[in-house]
Amino acid sequence: MATHQQTQPPSDFPALADENSQIPEATKPANEVQQATIAQDPPTSVFKNSEPIREDQIQNAIKFLSHPRVRGSPVIHRRSFLERKGLTKEEIDEAFRRVPDPPPSSQTTVTTSQDGQQAVSTVQPQAMQPVVAAPAPLIVTPQAAFLSRFRWYHAILAVGVLAASGAGTAVFIKRSLIPRFKSWVQRIMLEEETDPLKKADAKPSLAEEAVAAAKAASAAASDVARVSQEMMITKNEERKYFEDLTHLLGVQVQEMKSLSNNIRKLEGQSNNIPKIYSADQEVYNGSVTTARKPYTNGSNVDYDTRSARSASPPAAPADSSAPPHPKSYMDIMSMIQRGEKPSNIREINDMPPNPNQPLSDPRIAPKSKPWDYGQAPQDESSNGQWWQQKNPRSTDFGYETTTAARFTANQNETSTMEPAAFQRQRSWVPPQPPPVAMAEAVEAIRRPKPQAKIDQEAAASDGQSGVSDELQKITKFSESGGDGSGGIKIAEIQEETEQQHISQEGN
């Protein structure tokens, strides 16, 4: 530890020397430590990187250390401050080397005035301040002594006192203050209720208004809920009525559909009565002429053929989406509208025959008529007229009936009833029919129906047993040739048919 050498002041200032000798011993070691840290330079380390010293930072540190207030502060505080500012240890040491701390003897300065008078001024450094803080441990000692005298039973006693005081306070509030407060509130409420003037003049409070508004809102909500519930019930009833109405309408529509279907069936059955057709049937002006069906016994029974029903089911209604004519027909019609002539169509002479034209001598035998089937070929002179002879080709159509005999009887009967002019008109022989324009149509007409379609018709006719029975009766009657009770049987058939019509309409 370095020793501090005091410079002896001149003999002219004995008092100053005495004052310096009276410096407290506590401050001397501090100054000695400060000067020792400045005098002793730390040895440079071999492993430490040598960095260049920043002159500007050193100048700032010198200015900081040269400040009079900073000079009295401890060296440790000054070093830590400079380190926080970013100065290295070498720079701090260099700054302290350039600005050394003044020795303690330099704290006493002598000033000489111009007039020769001397004035002694003593500057007390800030390093003397820690000497005042020396009696601080004397203050802490009484507190430690007081704490040492505090015991655990003191804490228990304090807790007991606090608990007793709290319990007493609670009992006092419960038995004295609360009953008085309640009685005071009740008295005020009774005064307000018994005073009618105040009650009449007093305006409702916000709470009362809120309660009244809430009651009104709840009443309105209940009314709305009741009205909405009634509306829902009414709507449900209306929906039920509407569903019942739609159901009744649907039932009526179904009945109307069934009635229309029955009417169509009846119309189809009346139009599909079995008749005897051939390819050589005579057609004039779009109307087919057929004679009444006589019977071999000479009886001429005229009955309504529409009263009988056909065994075949009515034709299925055509699909509305399908075109009314095939594509080939539409193509031909479009070609005709454009003025083109189709390749497979021949022009036909459809001019009406000349009634004044004399009859030509036929070179070939006339074609047989439908009623000539079933007769043996005989000579015209011996067997009557030519239309009564049987054509050998009649078996091609599959019809072998006794209509020739019936027609003969009918001819004999009607010849006496018809006038002479009508008989002369019937004696006219029509010309030959025009050639067939579409052979495919004739072939389709003559071609028998496929077995699948026949099965479908048979299945559809199972539900029409009554109609089939009537047709069987009519067929048997026609095959028997008609006996004496023919008129009675036909009348019975007509009555049964009318009864079935009435029963279907009732359903």
UniProtKB/Swiss-Prot annotation:
InterPro entries: KPWE_PEX14_dom (IPR040554), PEX14 (IPR025655), PEX14-like_M_plants (IPR054154), Pex14_N (IPR006785), WH-like_DNA-bd_sf (IPR036388)
Sequence segments annotated as region (Involved in interaction with PEX5): 58-65, 78-97
GO CC terms: cytosol; mitochondrion; peroxisomal membrane; peroxisome; plastid
Start-end of Polar residues biased regions: 1-10, 32-48, 288-302, 378-394
Tissue: Expressed in flowers, siliques, leaves and roots.
Peroxisomal side: 1-152
Keywords: Membrane, Peroxisome, Peroxisome biogenesis, Protein transport, Translocation, Transmembrane, Transmembrane helix, Transport
Induction notes from the record: By wounding and hydrogen peroxide, but not by jasmonate.
KW Coiled coil (keyword) present: no
Residue ranges, Cytoplasmic side: 174-507
Main location: membrane
Region (Disordered): 1-52, 288-329, 344-394, 409-435, 448-507
Subcellular location: Peroxisome membrane
Bilayer-spanning residue ranges: 153-173
UniProt biased composition (Low complexity): 308-322
Pfam families: KPWE_dom (PF17733), PEX14-like_2nd (PF23020), Pex14_N (PF04695)
PANTHER family, sorted: PEROXISOMAL MEMBRANE PROTEIN PEX14
Function comment: Component of the PEX13-PEX14 docking complex, a translocon channel that specifically mediates the import of peroxisomal cargo proteins bound to PEX5 receptor. The PEX13-PEX14 docking complex forms a large import pore which can be opened to a diameter of about 9 nm. Mechanistically, PEX5 receptor along with cargo proteins associates with the PEX14 subunit of the PEX13-PEX14 docking complex in the cytosol, leading to the insertion of the receptor into the organelle membrane with the concomitant translocation of the cargo into the peroxisome matrix.
Self-association state and partner proteins as the record states: Interacts with PEX13; forming the PEX13-PEX14 docking complex. Interacts with PEX5 (via WxxxF/Y motifs).
Family: Belongs to the peroxin-14 family.
Name the record gives this protein: Peroxisomal membrane protein PEX14
Organism for this UniProt entry: Arabidopsis thaliana
Designated gene of the protein: PEX14
